Curated annotation (Swiss-Prot):
Disulfide cross-links: 35-76, 38-78, 46-79, 68-82, 90-103, 97-123, 218-252, 263-274, 276-297
Residue ranges of every copy of the IGFBP N-terminal domain listed in the record: 31-126
GO terms for MF: insulin-like growth factor I binding; insulin-like growth factor II binding; protein phosphatase inhibitor activity; receptor ligand inhibitor activity; signaling receptor inhibitor activity
Residue ranges of the TM segments: none
Record keywords: Disulfide bond, Glycoprotein, Growth factor binding, Growth regulation, Secreted, Signal
Region (Disordered): 189-217
Protein name per the record: Insulin-like growth factor-binding protein 2
Species: Sus scrofa (Pig)
PTM description: Cleaved by MMP9 leading to release of free IGF2 from IGFBP2-IGF2 complex, which contributes to enhance the motility and the growth of astrocytes. O-glycosylated.
C-alpha cells in the first residue's frame, strides 16, 4: 500500500527515504542526512501545535481533545503535525507514524513501493531489532525489507536506511555501495510496475495473460521520475537528497489520477509552493493560486467544472 499521498506537503525527502529503505539484506548500513536548520522566521510562521483528534467516545462539548505526539512535517518542513496512530493510513507524503510504529505496505502487495507512494500503507508496531525482533527476523521480514518507511525525526536527523540509534553510524561515503543496491531495487520495482501485476517467480504462469492496464499520465510521469532516480550518479559527499531537489514527484491518487493539489518539496525549512491541477491531465487550473500553503484546489476545480457545464448547455 504505497503512499498515495494525497493532499499533504510533498517532499522528495520521504521518497528517497522509502527507496533507500528497500535495500533488503544487502543494505543494512546507515546513511545519515541532516535536514537544513529551521530559521526563526520559518518557525514563527508555523501555526500553533495541533491537538489529537477527538476519541470515539467524545461528547458534544468537544473537550476530549488531547495533545498528540508532535512530529516534523514530511520531508524537511519546520512546522509540527500530529503523528499517525496505529491502524491509520500512511505513506511517503504523510506525517510519520507515532513512536514505536512504522509504515508498512499490505503484506500481499506485489508493488510495496508504489503502495507507499500512494499513501496506502498502514501504521503498525515496528518489527525490527530495536523493538524486540532478532537480527535474523529482521533479515527475513519481507515487508520491512521491501517497503518500510524510515522515520523523519523532529530533531532533523534522518536515517536513510532504517534504525534510529546514534551510535555506530557510518559516514555518508560508506553508503555508496548501499546506494548501488538501492538503484537496482528501484529499477526492478520499475520493471514490475510495468508488468501489470505479473505473478511472482515460482508460481505457474496462467495460460492466458491479460494485457497490462494502460498507465495514466500521472503514473507515467511517476515512472519516469523513478527511472531518473534509479540512474542518478552521486559523485560527491553532499548527500543523496541534494541531487533530487530539482525533481518534481507527481502526487497521484489510488486510481492513478493527479491529486488536485501538487506541491514542491520543503527546502531550507521553508514550505514548498503548492498549485492546483486537473486530475486527468495534470495541467494547471486557471485562476487557482500558487502559494506556500493550501490553495483550496477543490473550490477552483468545482468552479471550472461548473463553467464547463454551463458552456456545454449553451452549445446544445
Amino acid at each position: 500500500m504505497l503512499p498515495r499521498l494525497g493532499g499533504t506537503a510533498l517532499s522528495l525527502l520521504p521518497l528517497l527515504l522509502l527507496l533507500l529503505g528497500t535495500g533488503g539484506r544487502g543494505a543494512r548500513a546507515e546513511v545519515l542526512f541532516r535536514c537544513p536548520p529551521c530559521t526563526p522566521e520559518s518557525l514563527a510562521a508555523c501555526r500553533p501545535p495541533p491537538a489529537a483528534p477527538p476519541s470515539a467516545g467524545a461528547g458534544p462539548a468537544g473537550d476530549s481533545r488531547a495533545p498528540c505526539e508532535l512530529v516534523r512535517e514530511p520531508g524537511c518542513g519546520c512546522c509540527s503535525v500530529c503523528a499517525r496512530l496505529e491502524g491509520e493510513r500512511c505513506g511517503v507524503y504523510t506525517p510519520r507514524c507515532a513512536q514505536g510504529l512504522r509504515c508498512y505496505p499490505h503484506p500481499g502487495s506485489e508493488l510495496p513501493l508504489q503502495a507507499l507512494v500512494l499513501g496506502e500503507g498502514t501504521c503498525e508496531k515496528r518489527r525490527d531489532a530495536e523493538y524486540g525482533a532478532s537480527p535474523e527476523q529482521v533479515a527475513d521480514n519481507g515487508d520491512d525489507a521491501e517497503g518500510g518507511l524510515v522515520e523523519n525525526h523532529v530533531d532533523g536527523n534522518v536515517n536513510l536506511l532504517g534504525g534510529t540509534g546514534g551510535a555506530g553510524r557510518k559516514p555518508l561515503k560508506s553508503g555508496m555501495k548501499e546506494l548501488a543496491v538501492f538503484r537496482e531495487k528501484v529499477t526492478e520495482q520499475h520493471r514490475q510496475m510495468g508488468k501489470g501485476g505479473k505473478h511472482h517467480l515460482g508460481l505457474e504462469e496462467p495460460k492466458k495473460l491479460r494485457p497490462p492496464p494502460a498507465r495514466t499520465p500521472c503514473q507515467q510521469e511517476l515512472d519516469q521520475v523513478l527511472e531518473r532516480i534509479s540512474t542518478m550518479r552521486l559523485p560527491d559527499e553532499r548527500g543523496p537528497l541534494e541531487h533530487l531537489y530539482s525533481l518534481h514527484i507527481p502526487n497521484c491518487d489510488k486510481h492513478g489520477l493527479y491529486n488536485l493539489k501538487q506541491c514542491k518539496m520543503s527546502l531550507n525549512g521553508q514550505r514548498g509552493e503548492c498549485w492546483c491541477v486537473n486530475p486527468n491531465t495534470g495541467k494547471l487550473i486557471q485562476g487557482a493560486p500558487t502559494i506556500r500553503g493550501d490553495p483550496e484546489c477543490h473550490l477552483f476545480y468545482n468552479e471550472q467544472q461548473g463553467a464547463r457545464g454551463a458552456h456545454t448547455q449553451r452549445m446544445q
